[in-house]
Each structure stands twice: as C-alpha cells, then as structure tokens.
Amino acid sequence: LHRLIRRQRQMCIRDSYGVQLFDLAGQTRPKAMYFSEVMSYIQLTGVIFPYISEPNINIHQPAYGISSTMCHELSHICGFMREDEANFISYLACYNSDNTELRYSGAMMGLIHATNRLYRYDPNAWQEIYTLLPEGVLRDLAANSRYWKKYETPVGETADRWNDAYLKANDQTDGVQSYGRMVDLLIAFYRAQGLI
C-alpha cells in the first residue's frame, strides 16, 4: 500500500493541476499513515497534523479515494480550510487531470457526495440515476459502502461527533455536513460553465 500511495503521489506531482497544488503547498508531501486502519475506525481518510502541517493519508481506504484525499489535504495546506472548498478543489485537481486514475478518484468523490445529497432529497431520482451508472462504478460504490459499513461503530460515531464539534468551533457551522456541501460548489461551477 505504501507503494500505491507513492505512485499516486507521483501521478499528482506530474499532473498539471496536481503540480499547482504541490507548488502551492511548498515542500509538503502527503504521507501514508502507518495506522491507517485506525483512521478508518474514526472515519477519517486524511488529516493534517497542525504544528507541522503534514498531510497524512489513510491508505486503508478504497484505493480510488487516495488521490482525491491527497488533493483535499493539500488544499488545506494551501489555505483552503473549509471542508467543502477543499473537497471541491480536490475534485477539480483530480477531474481535470490528464491521468485516468486521478480523474476517476475525483469523479467518484463528487459522485458519492452528489448522490448522497440527492438520496436525502429525492430517493426516487437517486434510484433512477443509480440505474444509469456503469457496472464498474456500481461495483466500486458497493465496495465503498461495504468498507465503511465495517467502521460504523460507537468509536466511529464518537469520533464523528468530535469532528463535528471541532469544525463548528472553527466556524464551519455545518460541521461534518460541510464535506458534502461541495455539491453546492459543483452545481455553481457547472452552472457558470453553462453545463446545467
């Protein structure tokens, strides 16, 4: 897995959008977290250690999420502290990449947040869209759900409450819901592009 994160980090560095994130972040490079499964138990895919500004990545998560997590954490290093903004910047960096794996990572992150939001508001529309997704994407979504379901424990719920309180204390009034607010930024972006 450490090789995987090194390879994905190298892809980010070579990619034009990834280069911009790495340039802005200075010499900071994401590192594989040795205790990645512990991060899964507390429902984290990445974290910045505040005093040394070091992005650490949960490499135990589904592999396609590693690149978007790296870009998300690098967005924080670049000064974008709001979770919705970091997710949106990560989406743009990955999705506009020349690398297929990076594009897929960003697309899956955007898809997961968008379909989760849609399901809350209109389960019928969600079902309609879900049936249109390619078989490989459906397999990855099912694997993602199975993976995170294993970590829905009292420890995870407590960590989620702590993260929610931390975000709210840092002026992100939506708390953990702010991660999914990237959908608002996606909609605004695609509207500005005249695509919706």
Where are these regions (language model features)?
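Active-site scaffold of zinc-dependent metalloenzymes
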Residues: 27-70
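A cross-kingdom signal targeting lumenal/periplasmic-facing segments of multi-pass membrane
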Residues: 20-24, 28, 35-40, 55-56, ...
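Second-shell loop/turn segments in exported
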Residues: 56-60, 71-78, 100-101
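Pan-zinc metallopeptidase signature
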Residues: 136-196
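Active-site/pore-lining binding-face segments in mid-to-C-terminal subdomains
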Residues: 88-140
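Single conserved hydrophobic/aromatic residue that forms the stacking wall/gate
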Residues: 1-13
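Sec/Tat-exported extracytoplasmic proteins
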Residues: 17-21, 59, 78, 82, ...
